[in-house]
Amino acid sequence: MCGRTACTLAPDDVRKACTYRDKQGGRKWPNWRDGDSDKYQPSYNKSPQSNSPVLLSLKHFQKDADSSERVLAAMRWGLIPSWFNEPDPSKMQYKTNNCRSDTMTEKALYKASLFKGKRCVVLADGFYEWQRQNSEKQPYYIYFPQIKAEKSPAEQDITDWNGQRLLTMAGLFDCWEPPNGGETLYSYTVITVDSSKTMNWIHDRMPAILDGDEAVRKWLDFGEVPTKDALKLIHPIENITYHPVSTVVNNSRNNTPECMAAIILTQKKGPALSASSKKMLDWLQNKSPKKEESHSIQSPKLSQFGAPPKKTSAGLMQQWLKKEDGEPSPKRAKK
C-alpha cells in the first residue's frame, strides 16, 4: 500500500524533473495547468487529502491536443468518483488513496476511470512504508536509486535535469462536480501491486511504479495505448532502494527533513548506515521544502536486507488481460 509520500521540489523544479521527448524528438517541460502550481505545497510528509503533483495527458483538458502531450496538475489524494452525490467530498465512506490492481477492473469506484483512459502518473521524491516488528512498526523511505549521468558541456541541453529522479507511480483520476455548484475537484488514487522481492520483507504491497520514460509515455497516452496494453505496465519492479527513518514521520503533521533522513538502526533491527547516508542526514538537517527555492535531495543507495516472504497471486487483472488477449482462463481444479 502507499499512504504517505514526500515531494519536496519547488513547482518549477517539478516541471524540469518531468522533461520528456515529444513525437518530433524534441525535449520539453510540461506546463502546470492554470493555477495548479499554487495549489501544490512541497512537503516531507504528504498524506491523503493533500494535493500532489500529477502528470497526465494534455488531451484531458484540451480536446484538440495530441494525447502524447503532457501537463502537470495538482490533485487531491483520494479519488472522489464523478457519481458521488454528497455535497462534501470528505463524506466519502470508502478509502480511495490506493487502488488494488487485481480488482480495479471490477470495482465501480475505479473501473470507469480505468476504461475511460483517465490514467495519470503520481510524482514524489519517494514514499514511506512501515515494517511491523512485533508490537512496533519501523518506517522506511523508498525511492529510485539516484544515478547521475555525466555529460560534457557540449552534450548539455537546456531541458536537461540534473537533480533527483522523481518516483513515477501509476494512478487513476476522476473529476467531481459539486451538486450545488462550485469548482470541479480533480482527485486520484495510487495503483498498488504485490511487492517485489526488493521490498516484500517490509510490506506485502507496493505502488505500481513506472520505471522509465517509455513506461510513463505508454501509461499516459490513452489515445494511442488501449487499456489492455496499458495494464501490462502494472507490475512490481526491483529498481528501488530504501533506508530506515525516524518514527517522527508517523505523525502526518510533522513536516521536517527528519521525516526522510536516514537513521542508524540497532543491530537487531538492521545494518548500520554507510558514510554517504550519514552525510545525507547532515545535509537534510539544514534544509526545508520551500516553493520559492529550487533544490533536490540526494538519497543514498543502500543494500537490501531481510529475507523476503513468498509473493501472492496476480489476481483478477491478469485473468482479465488473458481474456482480452484471447487466452483461456485457468480452470479451478475439482475438489
From Swiss-Prot:
User: Which InterPro entries is this protein grouped with?
Assistant: SRAP, SRAP-like
What is a GO molecular function of this protein? protein-DNA covalent cross-linking activity
- Modified positions (Thiazolidine linkage to a ring-opened DNA abasic site) are 2
Ranges annotated as biased composition (Basic and acidic residues): 24-39, 321-335
Regions of biased composition (Polar residues) lie at 40-51
> What Gene Ontology terms describe where this protein resides (cellular component)?
replication fork
Q: Which EC number applies?
A: 4.-.-.-, 3.4.-.-
UniProt PTM: Ubiquitination of the hmces DNA-protein cross-link by rfwd3 may promotes its degradation.
Record-annotated site: Required for sensing abasic sites = 129
**UniProt record, GO biological process:** DNA damage response; positive regulation of isotype switching; protein-DNA covalent cross-linking repair; proteolysis
Which residue positions does UniProt flag as site: Required to stabilize abasic sites?
203
Q: Which domain of life is it from?
A: Eukaryota
Q: How is its activity regulated?
A: Formation and reversal of DNA-protein cross-link depends on DNA context. Catalyzes formation of the thiazolidine linkage in presence of abasic sites in single-stranded DNA. Mediates the reversal of the thiazolidine cross-link in presence of double stranded DNA.
Q: Name one Pfam family in it.
A: SRAP
Compartments annotated for it: namely: Chromosome
The residues responsible for catalysis, as annotated, are: 2, 129
- Residues of the region (Disordered) are 24-51, 284-335
For this UniProt record, give its keywords in alphabetical order, as a comma-separated list. Autocatalytic cleavage, Chromosome, Covalent protein-DNA linkage, DNA damage, DNA-binding, Hydrolase, Lyase, Protease, Ubl conjugation
What function does this protein fulfil?
Sensor of abasic sites in single-stranded DNA (ssDNA) required to preserve genome integrity by promoting error-free repair of abasic sites. Acts as an enzyme that recognizes and binds abasic sites in ssDNA at replication forks and chemically modifies the lesion by forming a covalent cross-link with DNA: forms a stable thiazolidine linkage between a ring-opened abasic site and the alpha-amino and sulfhydryl substituents of its N-terminal catalytic cysteine residue. The hmces DNA-protein cross-link is then either reversed or degraded.
Please identify the protein, giving its name as recorded. Abasic site processing protein HMCES
Organism of derivation: Xenopus tropicalis (Western clawed frog)
> What gene makes this protein?
hmces
